[in-house]
Curated annotation (Swiss-Prot):
It comes from the Bacteria. The gene is thrL. This protein is involved in control of the biosynthesis of threonine. Belongs to the thr operon leader peptide family. Keywords: Amino-acid biosynthesis, Leader peptide, Threonine biosynthesis. It comes from Yersinia pestis. The keyword Metal-binding does not apply. This is thr operon leader peptide.
């Protein structure tokens, strides 16, 4: 969901697992 997460591996992994970054 967050564009910043794309730059941050840790946040990306968290969102992908929990929110399902899309």
């Amino acid at each position: 969901m967050r564009y910043i997460s794309l730059n941050t591996t840790i946040i990306t992994t968290t969102e992908t697992t929990g929110y399902g970054a899309g």
